[in-house]
Amino acid sequence: MNRTPLLLMVLVTLLAAAGWLFSKEAISELPPAAFIGSRFLLAALLLLPLAWLREPPPSRAQMLRAAGCGTLLGASLLLWVTAISQSDALGSGAFIMSVATLMAPLAAWAAFRAKPGRHYWLTLPIAIAGLLLLSSSTHWGVSLSLFWFLAAATTLGIQLAVHRHFAQSIAPTWLTCIQLAMTGLLGTLLFLLTEQWPEAGVSHSIWGWFAASVLIATTLRYWLLTHALSKMTTAHAALMMLLEPVWTLILSTLFYGEPLGGAKLAGAGLVLYQLPLLLRSARLKTPV
């Protein structure tokens, strides 16, 4: 495996971290499920012409697999957006999500017999130590948002393993488009059943955050993610996605004043330290 997928994953994690900020601002006025539904449906519509022109249409079986993967993604994101609507500690939430992401290679091992390579077991202790330091000053009290984050994280870990597996056989733009459409449909359905549009309306500035969520944190991010996953192992992807809480913590510190002490800086350093190890292993092993 060359380094291009790993560098793509660095960009994906930056876009994902920005998505935390975009989403937090957007749902300050938009209903969470309505935000997810409209955001992902619009992103799917933007990708549809590209998929139609560049790639052959998927078979019915492939469409069903992609739709199932999209259902997992939709469930995870609806749980996630509910969690961030009730929490100001975005860095801590990103930590919880990343711990479950580390379990994705184990899920792939159980479901698809894709045993993680040696690099995963060697870098796993470093990654866990870094994540623990990143969350060192977090107050881990029992709160509703904590349970939402845990549920979202568990679903996301499974989805990542399934996504990577299907990315080997389904055209990337079609896979991304179908997943985003399913997520959007789930969000829209939940909005119609449980939410109401705010009577006071939505301010103009919120639509700017919404547009950034659609174009940057959804359309571009998930398209790049699918391309990267098609060329790397689940273990590589899971370890690379640990960069997301580092970027999220930095943004949360800059915009929301989340405390950033020496322990968190050390944790960020440990997470970043694994990058040279992954780049080295990328030259030695090709994904299966």
Predicted features, each with a name:
Residues L21-K24, A44-L48, M103-A110, H139-E195, ...:
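Transmembrane alpha-helical segments that form core, pore/gating elements
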Residues A34-L45, L73, V81-A114, A152, ...:
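Specific alpha-helical transmembrane segments that line the substrate/conduction pathway
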Residues L15-W20, A51-M97, P105, L133, ...:
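Specific transmembrane alpha-helical segments of multi-pass solute transporters/efflux pumps
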Residues L7, F40, I206-G208, L242-V288:
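C-terminal-most transmembrane helix of multi-pass membrane proteins
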Residues I36-S38, G93-V99, V162-L185, T218-L254:
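Helix-helix packing/entry segments at the starts of transmembrane helices
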Residues M1-L6, I27-A33, G37, P58-M63, ...:
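Juxtamembrane helix-entry segments on the extracytoplasmic side of multipass membrane proteins
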Residues L47, G68-C69, L73, P116-S136, ...:
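Hydrophobic transmembrane alpha-helices of multi-pass small-molecule transport proteins
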Residues M1-A34, G68-T71, A75, L79, ...:
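Glycine-/small-residue-enriched transmembrane alpha-helix faces in small-molecule transporters
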